[in-house]
């Protein structure tokens, strides 16, 4: 949980928010240090977020999408005002280093963000899906390593991700040209390139950082979002699309409006 705590502290600092003002912590991880206490409780203990309710989400590579969707729902319901989302994965701990079909793909990492209520709508439409019948395509049993049918995961991703993005754009009555960046889960470059091609959108609007970190599962989208922010590539009023996909099999997308 060290990476999770570090990411959480940096997110709070960047947002200029006191940890005691956080009233909900959602941790997304498939590689917790403990069965219990959960990762979010460890984050609470080490950040001083003493007023927060804590729970974890296990949604593998779609973890950030699911966590952000949950935060949106809780805030809109009036239950919580400031939510800390932390995605942290130690993929090296469940990787078979003799299996080159997986060991060269994954990396360790953590990313975090603070979501709070606002008069303006930041997190807009959400589109989520799950197909448990395909669960055996990507598995990691207790105390065992990742087993993946890469070909089936590829076929699933390049079909379902464009579908969910198109559904999202229709919900918002928004054209793809209005989107600044499509920030996808960083699974592999071939998947991202194929999604861009199927959508008919230039690849330069699909940022990629795989060469630096590999596939960090739920952490990949918040890590990439932080990089774009640090590089001053995000501006107020930008529209962004996040899309995640992975073990479950599950997938989904969210449209975000960058507000001042």
What kind of region is each of these model predictions?
Residues 36-38, 95-98, 251-255:
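Short acidic, glycine/serine/threonine-rich loops at helix termini
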Residues 19-23, 49-53, 77-83, 99-101, ...:
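Short coil/turn connectors at secondary-structure junctions
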Residues 5-8, 12, 32, 45, ...:
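Claisen-condensing/thiolase-fold acyl-transfer catalytic domains that form or cleave C-C bonds
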Residues 28, 58, 83-89, 115-116, ...:
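Short beta-strand segments
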Residues 91, 98-159, 163-166, 245, ...:
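Condensing-enzyme catalytic core mediating Claisen C-C bond formation in acyl metabolism
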Residues 14, 18-50:
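Anion-binding (especially nucleotide phosphate/pyrophosphate-binding) glycine-rich loop
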Residues 34-48, 84-91, 136, 140, ...:
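Acidic-glycine-rich active-site phosphate/pyrophosphate-binding loop
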Residues 1-23, 141-180, 191-200, 224, ...:
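Conserved active-site "lid/cap" helical segment
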